[in-house]
Amino acid sequence: MFLIAMRSTVWVFARRPYTRLPISKSGNGTINGRDGDTPTTIEHGVTVFSAMWNAWDLMVNLRGIGWDGVQMMHIPTSNFQVESRLTLVLLTLGRLTILGLVFDILSRCVHSLGPDTFGTPKGGSIFDPSLTLPERYMKSFIITLLSGFTSYVTIDGTYQVHAVLFTILFQQYPSQWPPLFDSPWLSTSLTSFWGRRWHQLFRECFVAVGSKPLERYLGRAGSIMGAFALSGVLHDIGIQGMGRGADTLSVAGFFVMHGVGVVMEHAWKQTTGRRVGGITGWLWTFSWHVLWGHVIVDAWARRGMVGVGFFPDAYRPTTLFLNWMSRKNVAS
């Protein structure tokens, strides 16, 4: 509901009406639902059905692909120039199979580190008081790192499921489902990570509702902090929806501190004239994520999110894969 409220606010204060752009069907020069050179709107009579269809598409199309008037954002380019729906579905199903297996491997690894605490739905802290400080934080570091990759796999897998369903059920085109991420592990700055390489699903809402209102009064720093603070509120509300209480300081604090990190990068550029980047930038980005990642992952773990099982034990991808390998070895 909070997301719907934000998107409704964006639509109410839009400077001009949203219009549909041509959709790429078979290499007609349109890239990711947007025309490569000079976008032109689709001129046709509006029927009740087309109006309802457009409204539905705008509602679920968080990145505004195929729409003119939506906040422009970075859309990653696919490594495969897919034009056939069947090819997209087959490639996506293959990717889903791999993502499912990777997700289950990561989950098993994390659960094995806390089988009686955070590795179960009842939850528990990732900080083990029975260990020495070096051991405790090495363990929490591993858990945080694995949980970060698990989050990426979960979000990407969910996106791939929707790509298959919408392509089959609603006959959408491959150009309407470009990649969601742009290799976030290659980020050499927090600005690059959040502005380009991580998913941009909520960017329009964060910019229009959280960033622009503060930019007028607090400048660039206020603009950045407004967007990240709103992101923190959105994710904290998601945690509260589980019915296990809120942890605003930890959940929202993670995003607020990333806003602080981005502000620091801009201050560095203004002071030195150089952008954050290279190997040093990668180490900085990785360290900042791990440092504050401990905070949000511990909040997830204490509420049982880390220990949730998505597959029945008998049908876990790793179980099915090992059973298949066992049968194959017996047969040979």
Regions found by a protein language model. Give the residues of each.
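Structural signature of transmembrane alpha-helix termini at the membrane-water interface
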Residues: 9-16, 105, 109, 165-169, ...
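Short, charged/polar micro-motifs that form catalytic or ligand-binding hotspots
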Residues: 83-92, 144-151, 184, 192, ...
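Membrane-lumen (extracellular) interface motif
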Residues: 1, 108-144, 216-221, 236-252, ...
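Intramembrane catalytic core of multi-pass membrane enzymes that act on lipidic substrates
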Residues: 1-131, 135, 144-159
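Membrane-interfacial catalytic/cofactor-binding modules of polytopic membrane enzymes
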Residues: 155, 164-240, 274-332
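Glycine- and small hydrophobic-enriched segments that form the cores of compact globular domains
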Residues: 124-138, 142-145, 149, 159-182, ...
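Residues in intrinsically disordered, low-complexity segments of regulatory proteins
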Residues: 52-55, 66, 267, 291, ...
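Hydrophobic alpha-helical cores of multi-pass transmembrane domains in eukaryotic membrane proteins
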Residues: 1-9, 93-106, 141, 145-149, ...
